[in-house]
């Protein structure tokens, strides 16, 4: 591609960003991804929920022309994306099983004529032979695969229908592919590249950090009473509560309703129309809380979810990260609360051991152990999360329960040296349970058969409890001194960073193991910033009225972050309104006048 054409496309991309989507500048990573896509090169985009993944393919789709096909797993997610694009004046459509034959034919005609620029479609429909024949005759410019982790058996949400997408590369070798996901560790990323046949892709891994989310944990004591108090502290904010079973979902929703709280149950056992009604009410701010199994959420693009509660511990960190990521997508403060009982972990482990032995069970065990380590962490929870995804961080976040209410610290160098020495002496071939048994001098047949009762480290930690040593080793993992090798049954292995600690050359503080029993802390009462709270409330009321009249969710009009900026800047002219993030040309034309009129009346005092 000629240099002049590249520069022109980059200029057009910024113009599309500002005029169509109403943002003044790209977020970190977006510009590189968009430029790479415009060069016709494959991309793998790993970006947190709320980080702006969709713009990475939507902007190039509008710059390069032709049709961009977006593979999406859920009808609700497709519809939501299409609604938002249409509100921004973008010719977008979706094909799904809820449409009539006439509606589907109309969409197909729009694709054939070049009128439709972005088409959202489920993987199973895309891979039908007759659809692929149509696709071959359209001006296809790019293929985007959203929720791409679903293609990998290593991923936490494997979907067999995604596996067939690998055949597309052979059919369309010249078309650039873009795979996108919010959650993919290094192994899953390699799987995505291999299974989709991505050719020398740009692999852009953005920070997994969601700094606006406060990570909290509460040990279960009287769980329902604790939950009721927590929800009441949220003062009417939108939230999602996840439970591991349908019966618990229904019971919890009923308990909330009996307390006068606006809540509804959502799980796969409900009729389709019931689920659709719950989701629509939640999207439109007519329902405060959804109590759900994991069946709920992937299709949710609601930016003003202020809290996510896990009433039961998830089976892996990927699920936890993705589900908590549904909070605070507007970048405003949000909270993730995990209710924890060690017995829940024991139950999940028993369920896992009942599954057939093999590599998949090993993967699930490794992921479950990591989730347990997160729940029982004595160090910054954000650091545990980020280190799990391979993003090394050193500084505590200051915005989790551990940072806000730190556990007591002690000089842990001697304990660390004992644990590291034991891992080393058993040749870095054994998991945590076995290492702790050697440390505490357990008298069992396996240790005797291995000859480890003769080691100098045998029993050097017998004065401390089993729980103490588990806590110490988990902290060493969190600090990056020890890793768990899943290929060797989660064997503990030392990293280079362990050497100076093992030799006693550096100080090391560890946390005294404790039972975590924090009272729920309500989020800050407001979002901070110097904006007019009274005007913000009026803008929200106007937004809801317009959304109801237009039959769309309120955030499709403007999200909370945009309204806060309006309440801060009080824009009175079209030019001033366009300087507000989230206000593009089309939205200004469609919604601008009533908002500017309300702001004018507020400034002049005419609405009192």
Stretch-by-stretch model annotation:
Residues 3-7, 11-20, 24-28, 32-44, ...:
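Helicase motor core with emphasis on the C-terminal RecA-like subdomain
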Residues 360-389:
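Short, charged low-complexity linear segments at domain edges
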Residues 173, 235, 378, 428, ...:
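Flexible coil/turn residues that form the inter-helical turn or adjacent wing/linker of helix-turn-helix
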Residues 1-13, 363-365, 394-608:
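Accessory DNA-binding and partner-docking regions appended to nucleic-acid-acting proteins
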């Amino acid at each position: 591609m000629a240099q002049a054409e590249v520069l022109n496309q980059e200029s057009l991309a910024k113009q599309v960003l500002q005029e169509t989507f109403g943002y003044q500048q790209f977020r970190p990573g977006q510009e590189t991804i968009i430029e790479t896509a415009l060069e016709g090169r494959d991309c793998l985009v790993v970006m947190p929920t709320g980080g702006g993944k969709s713009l990475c393919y939507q902007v190039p789709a509008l710059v390069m022309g032709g049709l961009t096909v977006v593979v999406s797993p859920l009808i609700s997610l497709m519809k939501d994306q299409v609604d938002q694009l249409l509100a921004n004046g973008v010719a977008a459509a979706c094909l799904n099983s809820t449409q009539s034959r006439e509606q589907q034919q109309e969409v197909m005609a729009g694709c054939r004529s070049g009128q439709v620029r972005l088409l959202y479609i489920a993987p199973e429909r895309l891979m039908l032979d007759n659809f692929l024949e149509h696709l071959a005759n359209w001006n296809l410019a790019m293929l985007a695969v959203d929720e791409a982790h679903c293609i990998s058996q290593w991923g936490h949400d494997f979907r067999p229908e995604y596996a067939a997408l690998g055949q597309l590369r052979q059919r369309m070798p010249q078309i650039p592919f873009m795979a996108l996901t919010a959650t993919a560790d290094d192994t899953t990323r390699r799987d995505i590249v291999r299974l989709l046949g991505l050719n020398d892709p740009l692999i852009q891994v953005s920070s997994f950090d969601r700094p606006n989310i406060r990570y909290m944990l509460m040990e279960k004591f009287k769980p329902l009473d604790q939950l009721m108090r927590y929800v009441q502290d949220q003062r009417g904010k939108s939230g999602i509560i996840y439970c591991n079973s349908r019966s618990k979902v229904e019971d919890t929703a009923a308990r909330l309703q009996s307390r006068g709280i606006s809540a509804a149950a959502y799980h796969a056992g409900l009729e389709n129309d019931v689920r659709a009604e719950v989701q629509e009410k939640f999207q439109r701010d007519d329902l405060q809380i959804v109590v759900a199994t994991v069946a709920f959420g992937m299709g949710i693009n609601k930016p003003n979810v202020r809290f996510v509660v896990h009433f039961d511990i998830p089976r892996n960190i990927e699920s936890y990260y993705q589900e908590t990521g549904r909070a605070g997508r507007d970048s405003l403060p949000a909270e993730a609360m995990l209710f924890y009982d060690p017995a829940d972990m024991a139950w999940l482990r028993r369920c896992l051991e009942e599954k057939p032995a093999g590599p998949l069970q090993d993967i699930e065990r490794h992921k479950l152990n990591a989730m347990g380590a997160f729940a029982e962490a004595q160090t910054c929870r954000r650091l545990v999360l980020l280190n799990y995804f391979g993003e090394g961080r050193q500084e505590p976040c200051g915005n989790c329960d551990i940072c806000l209410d730190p556990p007591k610290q002690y000089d842990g160098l001697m304990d660390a040296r004992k644990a590291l020495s034991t891992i080393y002496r058993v040749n870095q071939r054994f998991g945590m349970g076995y290492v702790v048994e050697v440390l505490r001098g357990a008298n069992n047949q396996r240790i005797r058969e291995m000859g480890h009762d003769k080691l100098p480290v045998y029993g050097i930690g017998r004065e401390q409890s089993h729980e103490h040593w588990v806590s110490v080793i988990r902290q060493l993992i969190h600090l990056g001194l020890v890793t768990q090798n899943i290929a060797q049954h989660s064997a503990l292995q030392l990293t280079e960073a362990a050497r100076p600690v093992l030799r006693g050359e550096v100080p090391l503080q560890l946390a005294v193991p404790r039972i975590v029993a924090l009272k729920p802390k309500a989020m800050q009462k407001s979002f901070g910033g110097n904006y007019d709270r009274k005007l913000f409330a009026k803008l929200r009321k106007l937004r809801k009225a317009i959304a109801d009249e237009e039959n769309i969710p309120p955030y499709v009009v403007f999200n909370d972050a945009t309204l806060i900026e309006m309440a801060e800047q009080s824009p009175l002219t079209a030019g001033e309104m366009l300087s507000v993030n989230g206000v593009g040309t089309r939205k200004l034309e469609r919604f601008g006048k009533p908002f500017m009129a309300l702001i004018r009346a507020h400034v002049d005092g005419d609405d009192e």
